[in-house]
Regions:
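Compositionally biased, intrinsically disordered low-complexity segments enriched in Pro/Arg/Gln/His
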Residues: 2, 6-9, 17, 33-35, ...
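Terminal low-complexity tails and localization/encapsulation signals of metabolic enzymes
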Residues: 6, 46-97, 130, 134, ...
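Conserved C-terminal structural/oligomerization subdomain of aldehyde/semialdehyde dehydrogenase
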Residues: 24, 91-97, 278, 315, ...
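Short, well-ordered beta-strand elements within core beta-sheets of diverse protein domains
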Residues: 95-101, 116-122, 169, 204, ...
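Long amphipathic alpha-helix in the N-terminal Rossmann-like dinucleotide-binding domain
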Residues: 111, 133-144, 156-183
Length: 539
């Protein structure tokens, strides 16, 4: 248990970090800290490391260098030193460095998790609830640090990073705590006890687009159900994962229960998926990468949970409020620079109202300010040069295949020569055979398709290899519900409903398998055991 005095020291040190604009804290590639204001550094050391010299401090800095992994409750050097530059997508400058792990680092983390599982799996619901409460308390202290890291690592505007990206982290923690308190782990049916037990060591592989959201919606239910774990965050956006790890360490997560190893997919990700002592792999990312995870996991017949790509339809029914529905649809696609797997990227409108819809979409897209994510812009950059090139190529492909360029288009926005910025783009008169209607673009690009009948709209919506999400807007509630019930997607949003963290999240078809969020997420981390004769009386 962390004492109140330690929490006070930590809060004071965090404030000192925020207030000091004179710190010189760039770490060199060996992980040693450069000189800075001594008092602030001493305070940071006292609160953040508990006297341990191997704790990587997080503070206001010109360069974030995170060169150690978190294994068995300690910050440790990689077995084979190797570093990677992390690029700020708004400036194209190096923002920091991380160490890249190896299969040997993964094995050390898995062995620590395996040892910890023996005791943590036997912890009580009350003990795990208390742990989640401590994590939530620590997260509140570090909320703004998390948000700032997300802005720097993947370009989310400050407001989005604070109010959505970082907020989702605490939302999933609170949801897991709520579910845990009432969750039924065992039930007697006749003389047979049906018991749900933690599955074991979990390998968690998370993406860069909603970094803490995806970490939290895996780690929180894993902790709540009594599992231990090894996390590999995206090497493209790793800063927020480091702060997340500091939060768990400060909250007193038992040694070995949570472990962090940075690295890339082909090395660290593959080692996690194929490790014989990992019992479950939970992966969020592209369908292509998900296939590799499943292939690596197959020889050990472990459980594989995946949340993959999407090409979500957004049906606007003939009796819908067209201005409201189109406006909401455009803004939803452009949110987070289009880098959301459940973005409603295929808007279906009645063909006779196509021109009206295009005019509304153009006005909304052109009203979105693009620019420095720390300056109040509505949309920041996409995450990397590779993503920028892919998005630009697909925009050009859409135009070549006959789509009408309604707004945006190829090239960077005017005045934004530095940074991976994309114009908010709307393509009209798209048909479902076009490349832009089939492939996940993962950028701020909306395709608008026309339909003649509601039956045709449903057929177009379902004509995709994906099935993560779908959206329907309509005026008559029962008719709108009937359309929603026929869409082949894991989550269907009716008339712009608010997010629900208790609602299961996951996909049909090539969008993955299994479910995250809320009570349904717990089942992914549990095995079911039947104990026959448990309730029988003695002969």
């Amino acid at each position: 248990m962390r004492t109140s005095a330690r929490r006070a020291r930590r809060e004071a040190a965090l404030q000192a970090r925020r207030d000091s604009d004179m710190l010189e804290t760039r770490a060199d590639h060996s992980g040693t800290q450069a000189r800075g204001r001594k008092a602030a550094q001493d305070a940071a050391s006292a609160e953040g490391s508990g006297g341990r010299p191997d704790h990587p401090q997080t503070r206001i800095q010109t360069m974030r260098d995170y060169l150690k992994f978190y294994i068995d409750g300690r910050w440790v050097e990689p077995i084979t030193p190797s570093t990677l530059e992390v690029i700020n997508p708004a400036t194209e400058a190096v923002a920091g460095h991380i160490s890249m792990g190896s299969a040997a680092d993964v094995d050390a983390a898995v062995q620590a998790a395996r040892r910890a599982f023996e005791s943590y799996s036997q912890s009580s619901v009350d003990e795990r609830a208390a742990l989640l409460e401590r994590i939530i308390a620590e997260y509140r202290i570090r909320h703004d640090d998390i948000a700032a890291a997300i802005t720097e690592e993947m370009g989310a505007p400050t407001a989005l990073a604070r109010k959505a990206q970082a907020a989702m982290g605490i939302g999933h923690l609170q949801t897991a705590l709520t579910v845990l308190k009432d969750y039924v782990f065992s039930e007697l049916r006749g003389t047979t006890l049906i018991r749900k037990e933690p599955i074991g060591v979990c390998g968690l592989i998370t993406p860069w687009n909603w970094p803490v959201n995806q970490i939290a919606c895996k780690v929180a239910p894993a902790l709540a159900t009594g599992c231990t774990m090894v996390l590999k965050p995206s090497e493209i956006a790793p800063f927020s994962a480091q702060i997340w790890t500091e939060i768990l360490d400060a909250a007193g997560v038992p040694a070995g229960v949570f472990n962090l190893v940075n690295g890339d997919g082909p090395t660290v990700g593959a080692a996690i998926a194929s490790h014989p002592q990992v019992d479950l792999v939970s992966f969020t990312g592209s369908t292509r990468a998900g296939i590799e995870v499943a292939r690596n996991a197959a020889p050990t017949v472990k459980r594989v949970h995946q949340e993959l790509g999407g090409k979500s339809p957004n049906i606007i029914l003939p009796d819908a409020d067209l201005p409201k529905a189109v406006t909401a649809g455009v803004r939803s696609v452009m949110n987070n620079s289009g880098q959301s797997c459940n973005a409603p990227t295929r808007m279906l409108v009645p063909r006779e109202r196509m021109q009206e819809a295009l005019a509304i979409a153009r006005e909304v897209a052109e009203s979105i300010t693009v620019g420095d994510p720390t300056s109040g812009a509505g949309m920041g950059p996409v995450v990397s040069a590779a993503q920028w090139k892919k998005i630009e190529a697909l925009i050009e492909k859409g135009i070549e295949e006959g789509a009408t360029l309604v707004a945006g288009g190829p090239g960077k926005p005017e005045g934004l020569d530095t940074g991976y910025y994309v114009k908010p783009t709307v393509l009209g008169d798209v048909n479902n055979a076009m490349t832009v209607a089939r492939e996940e673009i993962f950028g701020p690009v909306l395709c608008i398709l026309g339909y003649d009948t509601v039956e045709e709209a449903i057929a177009i919506a379902n004509d995709t290899p994906y099935g993560l999400a779908a959206y329907v807007s309509g005026g008559e509630p029962e008719a709108t519900r009937r359309v929603a019930s026929r869409l082949r997607a894991g989550q269907v949003n009716i008339n712009r409903a608010a997010p629900d963290l208790m609602a299961p999240f996951g996909g049909f078809k090539q969008s993955g398998n299994g479910r995250e969020w809320g009570e349904q997420a717990f089942g992914e981390f549990l095995e079911v055991k039947a104990m026959l004769g448990y309730g029988a009386t003695a002969d």
